[in-house]
Amino acid sequence: MRLLAEDGLPDRLSLDDDLLIEADNLRVLDALPAAAFDLIYIDPPFNTGGRQTRRTLEVEPLVGGTPGFGGRGYARTEVSRSDYADDFDDYLGFLAPRLRRARELLAVHGTLYVHLDYREAHYVKLELDRIFGRECFLNELIWAYDYGAKTKRRWPAKHDTILVYVRDPGRYWFDSDAVDREPYMAPGLVGPEKAARGKLPTSVWWHTIVPTNGAEKTGYPTQKPEGVVRRIVSASSRPGGWCLDFFAGSGTLGAVCAQLDRRYVLVDSNPAAIAVARARLDGR
C-alpha cells in the first residue's frame, strides 16, 4: 500500500499499487484514470446536522461492572476522542460533481454503491437518475439493524439505504455465486438440498453493526461492518479488479479488498481517518 498526501499528489495517478490518499477527494477523482474501476463504494457524510464522534475504548472485565454477555461485568475506559461536523448547507451541490466523476471512473461493467440514510436517500436517488439515467438504477438495498436510540414519537429509524447504479445496464458484472448465502426462514418449504445450500440474500440485509469488542472495531464514527461491504465487493468486482472509496473513513473497503484479492484506492481528507485506515491496512 502506498500513502499519498495532497501536497505531493500528481496531476495523473497510475494504478500500480493500492493507494491510501489524504486529500480533497474531488481533486483525486480528477487525477484517477477513467473507466478503471470495477466497483465504487462510498459512504458519504449523512448530513445529520450534528457532529460525529470517534471514541477509542478499552474494555476490561470487572466484577460488579456494566452487565455484559453471559452476565459478566465489564468496564470501559475512553482512551481518545475526535469528531467532525456532519452538516452541509448544500448537500447535493457538494455530492453531485463527485458522483458525475464517479460515473466516468467506472469500467463499462462497473457498479456504484452509495450508502446513505433516510435524510438524503431520496434526493440523492433523483440526482443519480439524472447522472446515470434511470435505466442504470439496479437496486435499492436496505441494511437493517437494531441499535441506537429509541423514540416513542415516531417509528425508530433502524436501517441505512444503499443505492446501486451500473455504468451499462447490459454489461455490468454481478456474481451471485460469490456471495455468502443465508438460511431460509422456512427451510421445510424448500426441500433439504436447497435448505442446505441456503439462499442468495435479498435486497434487505439484516446485519449487526460492528461489535464493540469485535476484531474489526476501530472506534471510528460511522464505521461500517466488513460483512456488509464483503457482499458488495464479492458480487460486483472480480479478483484482481480495482475498487474505490473516496469517503474512506476507517478503511473498511480496503480491509475487505485485501481479504478478497482485490486492489483498492481509498481517499479521505480527514487526518484521523487516514491514521485509522493506515493502522488497519499496514501489513495486509
Language-model regions, residue ranges each:
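Core catalytic lobe of class I
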Residues: 1-284
